[in-house]
A protein has these predicted regions:
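Short, charged/polar micro-motifs that form catalytic or ligand-binding hotspots
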Residues: 81, 85, 200, 204, ...
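Alpha-helical nucleic-acid-binding subdomain
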Residues: 128, 133, 252-487, 491-509, ...
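Conserved acidic
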Residues: 206, 436, 681
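P-loop NTPase Walker
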Residues: 1-35, 40-41, 169, 175, ...
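Generic detector of solvent-exposed, compositionally biased contiguous segments
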Residues: 54-75, 220-235, 239-250, 396-444, ...
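Phosphate/oxyanion-binding active-site loops and adjacent basic polyanion-contact surfaces
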Residues: 206, 210, 240-244, 453-457, ...
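Conserved helicase motor core of SF1/SF2 NTP-dependent helicases
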Residues: 257-258, 262, 271-275, 279, ...
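Extended, charged low-complexity regulatory segments
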Residues: 1-211, 215, 219-220, 706-707
Length: 712
């Protein structure tokens, strides 16, 4: 739509505001850089003095001064970095208030604060709340800096600024967007498109910034109470992970909570999502937080806690084996197994130490302590006791043997899975249970003989370590007690993994959980269910954050996704091309279609990130090799840590793309063979594949399409 003179004046005013803000930030640079150089010189000089000072009494105050100087240098370095980041994107919102006494105050809302430029960090709850909690012309009442403030919101606007340039303004007066020809006023449908926070031609491929789109209720849940667990449900592309990470960013900001970045963790389902999230965290002001896959985290602990080097192998096993190992019953069987060992140990200790009532009393009073620290503490008591040397040596040898046996977690898992009688006491009745347990017993014998472990055994080993140590060992003799934990794609974790993660936090309220059951693709891992999660956390169900609007996908794509998910309905949202269905005559024509399709997309926008998604990793590798002839040097493989989110064409498989997003997606061979309708996860896997795209979707196959597309 053409701009009126009033529109032009409106935009010019906003451009002047940005220019003056950038000018203020740039004027601060020389001062900050000079302070950094000065701090660096001071730190180096003090280090030189410490090195050259041999007198201990003279050296001590120098050491203290040096530590302070280096801390100041770190602050100066961060100030320098923060300024450069603000110059790229100084703010995303503005709010002006008129208070009851007639005074007017204006704030810019950004990802970081800068007092001189008038920018307030969005994590500064009371002030930022004026932007998030109110609309233009609404009355407000807030307590800010221990002072009651009331009035009304005179002005509220949202912005998109990229590389120091204003590209979008969203206000009650209308939405305006900059294009190659200049500024334009958007109509209603184009406004929906513009709410995507990544514009056309953007090289930035990471989780989008949705801060300006967060609702009042969502802001309240994210920022109001650091002691409350947060659960976020939502459809694909609705910003679940982004909202969760903003919750974490708020918790880590200054004095919003006690959480420290170094003692906080984000756990995701796959390696590619880990890379994606790691690339996003710095842009949200989150530094020093460990992001890992669950298996990566588990392995890092297991390799330190387990003797030797356990070898976990992907084994092709019947689904009932996987279901047993990821069931809620196996979790109880593990606890029962450790309890049985504890009872046997307790009986032995009582028999051996009955001659020494004082030591036996010392053992008995630690009855509620986990077995390994209990043995360690008791061994210390025995060592410090007045027992005769021979008796003391014999008792300590016994306790050391018991500790050694208790720490043999791998043999423990073998023994547990081999003990059909024990398992039968926990698993639900089933006509085939005996034959299933016989098979599991034989499989375990083979694994023990080869010193192999199934990848599905990893969680069992880790849970045993946790139960016997009273927590996950932290490598320094203590146990992990996280300040906060974010769990993404929660629906694909089973009861054992959930128990491990929930027990790893200092307080079960210090947790943020994200998920969508429609995207569950690991069917054997039975999700404990949102009702149980809510119950375990002591929450009310109505306190769950639900995000229903997809900011990623177009309406035609989400309409197809809902149909695949078994919930057919017409979806409102931004417009876009219909999904393209291509039934190829043979493999060669399928490849030719992919080449033509990708070429047309890249020609229209050379910065597009295009994903060609196969069902299995082997299929992805084969497709990449086939496309080499047609697209030499243009196609790369996306697999685990080989993922790159630079623009271009990526071939990958469905399990790698959970939680990710691309500009365009081609689903390769979504046929009945790859996605049989009889398998529960087929529907969810196709849903995941479809909803990875922002704009373009191609479905291409030689064989008939999977019946999942046509039957609810």
């Amino acid at each position: 739509m053409l701009l009126t003179e009033e529109d032009k004046q409106f935009i010019a005013e906003e451009e002047r505001l940005l220019e003056s803000t950038l000018q203020s930030l740039c004027q601060q640079l020389p001062q900050v850089q000079a302070a950094k150089i000065s701090a660096n010189a001071a730190a180096r000089e003090l280090t030189r003095q410490v090195v050259n000072e041999w007198n201990h009494e003279e050296r001590q105050p120098l050491v203290s001064d040096e530590a302070v100087a280096h801390h100041i240098l770190d602050i100066r370095k961060n100030s320098d970095k923060a300024l450069y980041e603000l110059i790229q994107e100084p703010y995303f919102g503005r709010v002006c208030t008129k208070e009851e006494d007639g005074s007017e105050v204006s704030f810019l809302i950004g990802k970081k604060s800068n007092i001189e430029a008038g920018i307030v960090d969005w994590r500064n709850g009371p002030i930022a709340g004026l932007y998030f909690n109110y609309k233009q012309e609404e009355e407000f009442y807030e307590v800010i800096n221990e002072r009651e403030r009331a009035g009304y919101i005179q002005l509220r606007r949202s912005y998109q600024i990229e590389n120091g340039q204003l590209v979008q303004i969203d206000a009650p007066e209308g939405m305006f967007r900059r294009n190659e020809a200049g500024w334009e006023r958007l109509d209603v449908e184009d406004e929906i498109v513009a709410h995507r926070s990544r514009g056309m031609g953007s090289k930035e491929k990471r989780l989008p910034n949705i801060l300006s789109l967060i609702t009042k209720d969502q802001f309240e849940l994210i920022t109001s109470n650091p002691e409350r667990p947060v659960i976020i449900q939502g459809s694909a592309g609705s910003g679940k992970t982004t909202v969760a990470l903003h919750r974490l960013a708020w918790l880590l900001h200054e004095e919003n909570s006690f959480a420290q970045a170094k003692n906080t963790r984000v756990v995701v389902m796959n390696k590619s999502l880990q890379i994606y999230v790691c690339a996003t965290l710095p842009s949200m002001g989150i530094e020093g937080v460990e992001t890992s896959t669950f298996n990566g985290w588990a392995l890092s602990i297991i390799r330190k806690a387990v003797r030797g080097r356990p070898f976990f192998k992907f084994l092709n096993v019947p689904s009932f084996v996987e279901e047993i190992k990821f069931s809620e019953e196996i979790l109880k069987a593990l606890e029962g197994w450790v309890e049985k060992q504890n009872r046997a140990l307790d009986a032995q200790v009582k028999e051996i130490f009955k001659k020494w009532p004082g030591l036996l009393k010392s053992w008995t009073k630690t009855n509620n302590t986990a077995v390994l620290p209990r043995l360690k503490d008791f061994a210390h008591d025995v060592k410090e006791s007045s027992l005769p040397k021979y008796d003391k040596d014999q008792c300590l040898a016994f306790l050391n043997r018991k500790s050694f046996d208790m720490e043999d977690y791998v043999q423990d898992v073998y023994n547990l899975l081999h003990d059909s009688g024990h398992l039968k006491g926990y698993l639900p009745p089933n006509p085939k249970l005996d034959s299933h347990l016989d098979y599991l017993k034989r499989l375990t014998e083979k694994n023990r003989a080869k010193n192999n472990l199934d990848y599905f055994d990893m969680s069992l080993v880790l849970r045993l370590i946790q139960l016997k140590n009273g927590g996950l060992p932290d490598g320094t003799g203590g146990v992990t007690s996280l300040d906060h934990l974010v769990i993404d794609e929660a629906q694909d974790f089973g009861p054992v993994e959930f128990a491990i993660m929930m027990s790893a936090v200092s307080d079960k309220r210090q947790i943020t959980i994200v998920g969508d059951v429609a995207q569950k693709i690991l069917s054997a891992r039975k999700f404990i269910g949102w009702n149980k999660v809510v119950e375990n956390l002591g929450m009310e169900e109505d306190s769950i954050i639900r995000l229903e609007v997809s900011f990623r996908c177009t309406a035609p794509i989400m309409t197809l996704a809902h149909k695949v998910a078994g919930d057919p309905k017409k979806v409102e949202g931004r417009a876009g091309p219909d999904p393209e269905w291509h039934k190829a005559e043979d493999r060669e024509s399928l490849l030719e279609k992919l080449v033509d399709w990708t070429h047309s997309l890249v020609k229209a926008d050379p910065y597009k990130l295009i994903a060609l998604i196969c069902r299995y990793p082997k299929q992805a590798m084969e497709l990449k090799e086939e496309l080499k002839e047609y697209l030499p040097g243009e196609v790369r493989l996306g697999h685990r840590d080989q993922f790159s989110f630079e623009p271009g064409i990526m071939v990958t498989n469905i399990h790698q793309v959970k939680g990710l997003e691309f500009d365009s997606v081609a689903l390769i061979e979504p046929d009945e063979e790859n996605y049989p309708i009889r398998r529960e996860e087929s529907r969810n896997m196709i849903y995941v594949g479809i909803t990875r795209t922002q704009d373009d979707l191609l479905l291409t196959t030689v064989k008939p399409f999977s019946r999942v597309f046509f039957y609810n």
